[in-house]
Amino acid sequence: MKNLFLYCRAGYEKDCAAEIQQRAAELGIGGFVKANRDDAYVVFQGFSPDDGDRLAKELPLDSLIFARQMFACGDLLDDFSPEDRVTPIAESLTEVERAGELRVETPDTNEAKELSAFCRKFTVPLRQALKKRGVLLDKESSRRPIVHVCFVAPNKAFTGYSLSNNSSPHFMGIPRLKFPADAPSRSTLKLDEAFIHFIPREEHETRLRSGLNAVDLGACPGGWTYQLVRRGMMVHAIDNGPMNHDLMETGQVTHHRADGFKFEPARRNIYWLVCDMVEKPARVAELMEYWAIQGWFKEAIFNLKLPMKSRYKEVSQILANMHAILKENGIHEFHLACKHLYHDRDEVTVHLWLRPSSPWI
C-alpha cells in the first residue's frame, strides 16, 4: 500500500502533516500530504507503491508527536453503494493476510461519531467476509496485523492495516479513562494517560510503585498529585494556591507554598517530577533541564503549552535544545519522548527518563 493514514486531534492536522512529511523524508520516502482542517486525520500519499507499507513498519508510532494512530492504506474508497459496502471493502484488503483483529473506526469529530452505531453493526458482516477471504484469522490474535476501516463519511472509507508491534492498542488511538469522582480536577486524566502511554504496563510495579517520592510543581488544586497519591507515593506539592482538602488528609502530601520555578528539594530522593504549569513552553523546558542537570529526579512528566502557530516547529526545537543541553552537561544516557495525548488540549506531554540502565537507589 502506498499511503499512510494518521489520526490526530481536530485542529492539529497541519501539525500532524508537517511532522509526517519531515519524518517520511528522513526515511527517504517521498510524497505529499492531504489534510483538511478539523477532519481529525491526515493522509500521506507516497510516490511508490509500497511507501505506506514501509512507513507502517519503519516509522515508530511512539516517535510521532501528533499522531494517535496510523495505518498503511490505499486510496479513498468512495464508489460503493449503501446496499453493498462489504464487497468493495473486502476486495481492497486482499494484500492483507491472516490479520488478527478488525477495527471499524471513524475520525474523532462530532460529525464522524454519528457513524459509530453504523460502524458497530457493520463490523459483524465485514468480519465474516474477511474471514472467508483469509484476510482475518478465525480467532483474534494480538501478534498479527490489525485491519483498519475508517469511515470518514457514510459512503467513504479508507482501508488498510497496522502492525501489532507498531500500533496503538486503543480503538482510534484513544484510551478510555474514567474520571475519578474524588479527583480535584479533570487535569488528573492527563497524568493518568501519560503513565499509561509512556510506562509499559509490566513496569508499573517498579517505576510507579508505592513508597516512591515525587514532586508536583504547580500542583494546586491537586489533579496530578491525585494520581501520585493513589499509586501510594509520597508527594511534595509545590504551589502558592490551596490544595484539595481530601488529598491533604491522606497524609501522603506535603504542601509547600512556594513558586514552582524557585523550589529546590531538600534531599536527592525524588523519583518522579511532574509539572503542569501554565507558562511559556521554553521556560518550563529550561526548568526541567535545570532539575535534570542537578540530578534531582529520575523520571519526569511535564506539559508544554503550545503556541497558536508553528506548533510542530516550536515543540521540535524545544526537544532538540533539551537533548543538546543534557548532553552538554554530561547526561549522555536518557530517554526523551513527547506525545499530544487525547486528554491534552493545546499542549503536549513530555516524558524524560534519566539514565534508564542505572538502578534507582
Curated annotation (Swiss-Prot):
Gene Ontology molecular functions: S-adenosylmethionine-dependent methyltransferase activity
BP term (GO), one: methylation
Annotated SUPFAM superfamilies: S-adenosyl-L-methionine-dependent methyltransferases (SSF53335)
GO cellular component: cytoplasm
A Pfam family that the UniProt record links to this protein: FtsJ
Alphabetized Gene3D superfamilies for the sequence: 3.30.2300.20, 3.30.70.2810, Vaccinia Virus protein VP39
NCBIfam families: PRK11760.1 (NF008734)
Protein name: Ribosomal RNA large subunit methyltransferase M
